[in-house]
């Protein structure tokens, strides 16, 4: 049975334009061992904001039971979440969903991690786990602008890291695909998370390879009951086969679902 826990905020700060890093501690953090999973956060106990907010897991410190969450404060709920201070508690449901398959890559092989915007955070925990497994990691991160970018130094400590910004204020001007076109990157497995247009480009480029995408989607319940986050299965002409992003995903092999 999925359970919730009121976790205590140990650190909460803005790390980029509209991007916040929140660290919390709780007993259930020890169960959050699969990179790519997410948690559902209840912003407050009032009746005004009923739905929980899905936030991807950025990092887990198993020794201290500390969970790191990165999110963009853009809606009413996340803006209110951004006002919470150290010492306060937040109601968290999780871990939820299916994470990135670590078994898809062997020790000594190279993983290519491709992230865009708020799809970057879950790749950090993935990169750390891959590094601990003995894999090599290459990171390609995309942002709108330098002021929106974050965690470059953290990713760089784990492997070669490239950055692309739409306005050219940091790294390569353009999208992550521009970096992929310019650099002769050698890899064995691809893991990606980001906005749908980026995932479409990644899927078209790496179809038929060992490649996996994590989808960003608004979710109602987070446990597969409300059917608010379904996506169709590739090749289903009748359109009756689907996957629930919250429980079957958010991670899928490239080509399995329609983007």
From Swiss-Prot:
Free-text comment on the cofactor: Binds 1 [2Fe-2S] cluster per subunit. Binds 1 FAD per subunit.
Organism, as annotated: Halalkalibacterium halodurans (strain ATCC BAA-125 / DSM 18197 / FERM 7344 / JCM 9153 / C-125)
InterPro entries linked: Cyt_c3_hydrogenase_gsu, Dihydroorotate_DH_ele_sf, Dihydroorotate_DH_Fe-S-bd, Dihydroorotate_DHASE_ETsu, FAD-bd_FR_type, FNR_nucleotide-bd, OxRdtase_FAD/NAD-bd, PyrK_electron_transfer
UniProt keyword terms in alphabetical order: 2Fe-2S, Electron transport, FAD, Flavoprotein, Iron, Iron-sulfur, Metal-binding, Pyrimidine biosynthesis, Transport
Protein name: Dihydroorotate dehydrogenase B (NAD(+)), electron transfer subunit
NCBIfam families recorded: PRK00054.1-4
Alphabetized Pfam families for the sequence: DHODB_Fe-S_bind, NAD_binding_1
Binding partners and assembly: Heterotetramer of 2 PyrK and 2 PyrD type B subunits.
